[in-house]
Curated annotation (Swiss-Prot):
Disulfide bonds join C64-C73, C69-C81, C74-C91, C79-C93. The modification 4-carboxyglutamate is found at E50. The keyword NADP does not apply. One of its GO terms (cellular component) is extracellular region. Transmembrane segments: none annotated. Residues 25-45 form a propeptide. The modification 4-hydroxyproline is found at P56. It comes from Conus mustelinus. The cysteine framework is XX (C-CC-C-CC-C-C-C-C). Displays a mini-granulin fold, a structure composed of two short, stacked beta-hairpins connected by two parallel disulfide bonds. This newly described fold is derived from the same cysteine connectivity as knottins (ICK fold). The name 'mini-granulin fold' comes from the structural homology with the N-terminal region of the human granulin. This is Alpha-conotoxin-like Ms20.5. Its main location: secreted. It is found in: Secreted.
């Protein structure tokens, strides 16, 4: 089988939701909420965890250990999410 055919076969098998171009971490959850969010709640570790499900009814989503801003995760704690006209959401971090 030629290499191109193998690559195309692999891309068809692996859903694109496994890959996150925004730099966040894709995490598996369930229909009641996100598994990573519940894990972080144990022991008071959920202070800054924010999660969102990619599509309604999906068990896949993205979780940030910092602030979630639009489709991205901010690089550090203490950042705020701002909206720039024509550029979309972005993180504004102190210092």
């Amino acid at each position: 089988m030629p290499k191109l055919a193998v690559v195309l076969l692999v891309l068809l098998i692996l859903p694109l939701s496994y890959f996150d171009a925004a730099g966040g971490q894709a995490a598996e959850g369930d229909r009641r909420g996100n598994g990573l969010a519940r894990y972080l709640q144990r022991g008071g570790r959920d202070n800054e965890a924010e999660c969102q499900i990619n599509t309604p009814g999906s068990s896949w989503g993205k979780c940030c250990l910092t602030r979630m801003c639009g489709p991205m995760c901010c690089a550090r704690s203490g950042c705020t999410c701002v909206y720039h006209w024509r550029r979309g959401h972005g993180c504004s971090c102190p210092g």
